[in-house]
């Protein structure tokens, strides 16, 4: 049994029957016409063997106003008398699915008055006859306390690997500032009033490229074992530099490799990357540090078999930047970063999860000031430790994939985005191809 700390990082609330989870505190159910209230618990029992697979996920962040690098979003204003339509691509298929919602960074109870899910027909369109109601403890809606998360009942909607789904959430009252994921690389749509049952896009005239309250989709694989792979990382994992709407992030590349029928590896891939995220310290735009969110973003996912970690680049580069998004930004030594990685490895191994390290990418030549000789030395020291210590169960050497043969401190020209730092589509695909599937 793993005992959760008192809500400091957000506690998962499960509403309805969930395999492998036992409620310790009581759950309050109401009639289907009224929302179920997700009550707190203080401990859970988790089973290693579960049919649920994490098929999609997002690392949630505190609300923050948009800026020039991420565009505008609706997190600070929240929603009132609106329907929010979000389109995501699942990495694994199953006979049923369920939805995870988060109010981890909310300041008030989040009342979700209704939810539906269906197959995306492109943009805000939904395939006819595919919409299904999502319930919570048999009720049409739920109330999620601040600092908590909720998991829906199982929905009888079958899914296929790499299929796009549409999740619709209805908010009647004001939500307050929204727990969200800032850099979605995909569109979320908003309509005034109740449009949970609409298959057309007519009412959804406003859009943004962030996700709101939606933190995960699980599918029932029908096989009781561990089949979830989680990427924990920064903008490399989040997909900065790849084509918006094209699902070309590093985790997407792995999901596509795993979905190839021969040999099929029916694993789900969850993306827990956060642009500007750090390993050791929280930041204004990156939210919680990697060590601070490891429990929620990795351990609380169902059936996790491996975690793949790329963190530390922003810890190294932030001291050179005068950007409020990355503050606080004190200098961090390689020894401190290695200690942080060791904490993640220990936490993973304590739960029987493989830990795979990803070497930090080349940083020289970026359009923003993140590189100097001291930063390069710290990067090289961390990468050398990853390659030689044997402390990670395996290493994905993204540094060597991305390095320019003519100057290994810089990224390879054909693999880098126009900002001179982040992998483009080709670079992300090359890194995904370098991971040994037998290491998972």
Q: What is each stretch, according to the model?
A:
Residues 56, 80-86, 109, 115-123, ...:
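Conserved SGNH/GDSL esterase-like catalytic core that processes O-acyl groups on lipids
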Residues 310-315, 344-379:
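Active-site segments of SGNH/GDSL-like serine hydrolases
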Residues 237, 255, 259-263, 299-303, ...:
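Sec-exported extracytoplasmic/periplasmic mature domains
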């Amino acid at each position: 049994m793993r005992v959760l700390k008192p809500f400091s990082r957000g506690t998962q609330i499960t509403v309805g029957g969930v395999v492998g989870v036992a409620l310790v505190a009581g759950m309050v159910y109401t009639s289907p016409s009224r929302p179920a209230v997700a009550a707190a618990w203080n401990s859970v029992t988790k089973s290693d063997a579960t049919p649920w697979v994490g098929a999609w996920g997002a690392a949630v962040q505190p609300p923050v106003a948009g800026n020039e690098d991420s565009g505008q979003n609706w997190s600070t204003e929240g929603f009132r008398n609106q329907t929010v339509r979000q389109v995501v691509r699942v990495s694994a298929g199953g006979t049923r699915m369920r939805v995870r919602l988060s109010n981890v960074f909310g300041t008030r109870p989040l009342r979700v008055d209704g939810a539906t899910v269906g197959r995306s027909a492109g943009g805000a369109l939904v395939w006819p006859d595919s919409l299904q109601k999502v319930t919570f403890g048999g009720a049409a809606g739920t109330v999620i306390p601040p600092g908590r998360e909720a998991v829906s009942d199982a929905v009888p909607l079958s899914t296929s690997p790499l299929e796009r789904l549409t999740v619709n959430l209805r908010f009647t009252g004001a939500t307050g500032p929204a727990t969200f994921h800032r850099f979605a690389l995909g569109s979320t749509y908003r309509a005034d009033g109740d449009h949970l049952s609409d298959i057309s896009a007519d009412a959804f005239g406003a859009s943004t490229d962030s996700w709101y309250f939606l933190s995960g989709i699980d599918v029932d694989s029908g096989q009781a074992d561990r089949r979830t792979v989680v990427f924990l990382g920064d903008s490399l994992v989040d997909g900065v530099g790849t084509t918006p709407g094209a699902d070309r992030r590093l985790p997407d590349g792995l999901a596509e490799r795993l979905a190839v029928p021969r040999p099929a590896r029916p694993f789900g891939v969850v993306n827990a990357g956060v642009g500007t995220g750090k390993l050791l310290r929280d930041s204004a735009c990156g939210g919680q540090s990697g060590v601070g969110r490891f429990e929620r973003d990795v351990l609380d996912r169902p059936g996790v078999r491996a975690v793949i970690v790329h963190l530390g680049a922003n810890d190294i580069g932030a001291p050179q930047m005068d950007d409020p998004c990355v503050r606080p930004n004190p200098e961090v030594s390689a020894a401190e970063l290695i200690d942080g990685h060791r904490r993640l490895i220990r936490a993973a191994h304590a739960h029987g999860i493989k830990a795979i390290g990803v070497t930090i990418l080349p940083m020289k030549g970026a359009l923003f000031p993140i590189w100097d000789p001291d930063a390069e030395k710290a990067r090289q020291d961390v990468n050398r430790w990853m390659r030689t210590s044997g402390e990670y169960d395996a290493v994905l050497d993204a540094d060597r994939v991305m390095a320019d043969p003519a100057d290994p401190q810089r990224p390879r020209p054909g693999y880098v985005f126009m900002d001179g730092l982040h992998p483009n589509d080709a670079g992300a695909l090359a890194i995904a191809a370098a991971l040994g599937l037998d290491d998972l």
